[in-house]
Amino acid sequence: MTKCNLPEVVVTGVGVTASIGQGKEDFASSLLSGRHAFDVMKRSGRQKDSRFIGAEIASLSYPDRLSKKMLRKASFSSRAALVTLTEAWEEAELDDADSSRIGLVVGGSNFQQRENFEVYERYQDRSGFISPAYGLSFMDSDLCGICTDQFGITGLAYTVGGASASGQLAVIHAIQQVLSGEVDTCIALGALMDLSYMECEALRALGAMGTDKYADEPENACRPFDQNRDGFIYGESCGALVIERKETALRRGLKPYAALSGWSIKLDGNRNPDPSLEGEIHVIQKALERARLLPEDIDYINPHGTGSFIGDEIELKALRACRLSHAYINATKSITGHGLSAAGIVEIISVLLQMKKSALHPSRNLDHPIDDSFHWVNEKSISYRIKNALSLSMGFGGMNTAVCIQNIEKCGGES
């Protein structure tokens, strides 16, 4: 391999499952064409007295390597995790790696609220018939257990929760585990958060989730950074990244996707959903500092961009304060919806695939940007080779995270 002055940590495998496609090729194709799956949600346990708009996964295709018995007992979130992890695992050729040197960090919590609520409704008057398997599956750690069981991971595994920043928290933890030497390879998995209508009602009452304003035209509901936005629109998704040191990747003969060159976490000391301008500025600046990048080095931003009334405004103010309004910017959630715990990883995957395709996807429904001085990618995808990207995630409870992603296309060939 050629010797390159790369940052220490790289991505060697990617897996993604979302409403717009299972697998990175279908996902990338949908992103670049702006193809979406927004509709009034129909999955059992999601509708009652209100109409909630979202982007649901139509079906899952299961690889042969997965245990059919395990799949029958697993929750929907766990099944999505297994198929997503399989794609990343096989691309990174981890069957040949030492399983005791592989770790797994799962981003998220409360993964199966919809199924939990259905269990309650079904068995509230006959609790003696509840399956013993529910004693395992209602715990978040069961998702770790299922994945480590199926793939023989014996290094480490745990979950990290940070609301909608959970995915990026998992990525940062995975980076730290690799750099500490605890494991050689660590998988960050953003798990599918399976909402019931109860969570949808509460999030709508909180003013976070979109109303039924667009129920008769669901394709127009998800509109981050647009003046007519109406709150976030939920989108089922799951993403996985295989993260390792560059030396490990090159020794194993792998060509990395990109380097994770900088990252930061900052708390606001606030349990409410309110965003913090200071917190967002802090993580942007610290991530750039760790990556040894200047603001002008960033040429693409993948923002948190949910379509919330206050959050979108604050995020653009933070980017402007950090002198980043020159960079191209688009909103992945305008196509995928908001994956909540999975969003941070799914959006880093969006960055990696746009790097690979040398193209930027459009932002749907960005008819009237709240600030048209930014360098928006609007109605159509464009050809562009990203050099340095910044991805942001924020979560309820004062969570702010940022990750810098460096294109290393010229650093992976044979010498």
Curated annotation (Swiss-Prot):
Record key words, sorted:
Acyltransferase, Antibiotic biosynthesis, Cytoplasm, Lyase, Transferase
Which GO BP annotation is one of this protein's?
Answer: fatty acid biosynthetic process
Q: Does the keyword Acyltransferase apply?
A: yes
Tell me the Pfam families matching this sequence. ketoacyl-synt, Ketoacyl-synt_C
Q: Does the keyword Membrane apply?
A: no
N-terminal signal peptide: none
Enzyme Commission number(s) of this protein: 4.1.1.87
Q: Give the SUPFAM superfamilies listed for this entry.
A: Thiolase-like
EC class of this enzyme? lyase
- Where is this chain's protein located in or outside the cell? Cytoplasm
Q: In which pathway does it act?
A: Antibiotic biosynthesis; bacillaene biosynthesis
Q: Name one GO cellular component term.
A: cytosol
Substrates-to-products reaction catalysed:
malonyl-[ACP] + H(+) = acetyl-[ACP] + CO2
Where would I find the Ketosynthase family 3 (KS3) domain in this sequence?
A: 6-407
Disulfide bond residue pairs: none
GO terms of molecular function: 3-oxoacyl-[acyl-carrier-protein] synthase activity; lyase activity
Query: InterPro entries this protein is in?
Result: Beta-ketoacyl_synthase, Ketoacyl_synth_C, Ketoacyl_synth_N, PKS_Beta-ketoAc_synthase_dom, Thiolase-like
Record function comment: Involved in some intermediate steps for the synthesis of the antibiotic polyketide bacillaene which is involved in secondary metabolism. It decarboxylates selectively the malonyl group attached on the acyl-carrier-protein AcpK (Mal-AcpK).
**Record-stated family:** Belongs to the thiolase-like superfamily. Beta-ketoacyl-ACP synthases family.
Q: What is this protein called?
A: Polyketide biosynthesis malonyl-ACP decarboxylase PksF
Per the UniProt record, the lineage of the source organism begins with:
Bacteria, Bacillati, Bacillota, Bacilli, Bacillales
Gene designation per UniProt:
pksF
